[in-house]
A protein has these predicted regions:
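Negatively charged, low-complexity tracts enriched in Asp/Glu with abundant Ser/Thr
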Residues: 1-27, 57-60, 94, 98-106
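Mixed-charge, Lys/Arg-enriched low-complexity segments
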Residues: 52-106
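Acidic, low-complexity intrinsically disordered regions
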Residues: 3-4, 11, 40, 53, ...
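Weak global preference for isoleucine
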Residues: 3-4, 29, 33-34, 84
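Amphipathic, interaction-prone secondary-structure segments
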Residues: 11-54
């Protein structure tokens, strides 16, 4: 997982690496990278969430993508950073809109 870990470190993310996963974060966003295993059909998995609304991955994932190779995942991060952040912002906006409806429209 060194290719991905180095990419995050080179781009200013705080990185925590475990046996089969890597978490990278800034003050606003959290990334989870999972090594291939049976649960991911042998693919690398990337999940991304806003830190402010993070509860657990099952409830908070704004982006979830799968890749055949570690290099493919790294290239996706490199080439799609703006789109990843846009998707996280869109997801966060939808969450706040739902909270507003629950609190003020019911």
């Amino acid at each position: 997982m060194n290719i991905i870990k180095n990419w995050f470190k080179d781009n200013g993310y705080e990185v925590d690496e475990y046996e089969t996963t890597l978490q990278a974060k800034t003050d606003t966003i959290l990334f989870l990278v999972v090594k291939p295993h049976n649960g991911t059909n042998g693919k690398w998995m990337l999940r991304v969430a806003a830190l402010v609304s993070f509860d657990r991955w099952a409830n908070s994932t704004a982006v979830e993508e799968f890749f055949n190779t570690e290099t493919g995942l790294r290239n996706y991060l490199e080439n799609n950073q703006l789109y990843i952040y846009k998707d996280v912002l869109r997801s966060l906006s939808e969450e706040y809109e739902e909270m507003y409806r629950v609190n003020y429209e019911d």
